[in-house]
């Protein structure tokens, strides 16, 4: 399926996961404007990378394991206004991290990671790989962020609320800390079902976690004003 945003176009036909609200919100919410280098882990169609390119002057490295998704991603990069700032690497993030050098630390890392535990069935194999934590466990993701993130850098993720307890358990044994969370609420009156997270290298003393909420839709089904402000630079409707 193809999606046209204000400044770029996405074809996600060969990608395991289609363009969705989670990635759009993450790409619009992440604090990228000051970053000179950005790493997109599990780039898929390249949506997060393209949003980062639109919102900053950063050079962006996009790592995607699946070959078909990587081809679609490269196509989308080539057809964008920022092709000279976008680099695709068809590799696992684990292999990529083994090759990284000090000079390649990233100011910001963005990732919409797999979120289904082993045993949950997905219809297509690509979709299964994109959605199952088996392809990138939380422990492996946090290790990759620790290796690739610049000393003063941040990493922005989006996770299901039901995965947060497990994520925090693994995070507690890592070299990273959670410095900000924004609870994402699908509609007024509901409980949050997604969490936007900002990670940084651990400091002493620890920084208190900043907490906030974003509600996506009013009871009428229309986007809230907060959501409109977040996505207005991307959606044609606004």
UniProtKB/Swiss-Prot annotation:
Pfam family, one: MTS
GO MF assignments: nucleic acid binding; rRNA (adenine-N6,N6-)-dimethyltransferase activity; tRNA (adenine-N6)-methyltransferase activity
GO cellular component, one term: cytoplasm
InterPro entries reported for this sequence: DNA_methylase_N6_adenine_CS, rRNA_Ade_Mease_Trfase_CS, SAM-dependent_MTases_sf, Small_mtfrase_dom, tRNA_Adenine-N(6)_MTase, tRNA_adenine-N6_MeTrfase
Subcellular compartments: Cytoplasm
GO biological process, one term: tRNA processing
Enzyme Commission designation: 2.1.1.223
Keywords: Cytoplasm, Methyltransferase, S-adenosyl-L-methionine, Transferase, tRNA processing
Catalytic activity: adenosine(37) in tRNA1(Val) + S-adenosyl-L-methionine = N(6)-methyladenosine(37) in tRNA1(Val) + S-adenosyl-L-homocysteine + H(+)
Enzyme class: transferase
Transport in keyword set: no
Main location: cytoplasm
Disulphide bond pairs: none
Function: Specifically methylates the adenine in position 37 of tRNA(1)(Val) (anticodon cmo5UAC).
Protein family (similarity comment): Belongs to the methyltransferase superfamily. tRNA (adenine-N(6)-)-methyltransferase family.
Protein name listed in UniProt: tRNA1(Val) (adenine(37)-N6)-methyltransferase
Organism from which the protein derives: Shewanella baltica (strain OS195)
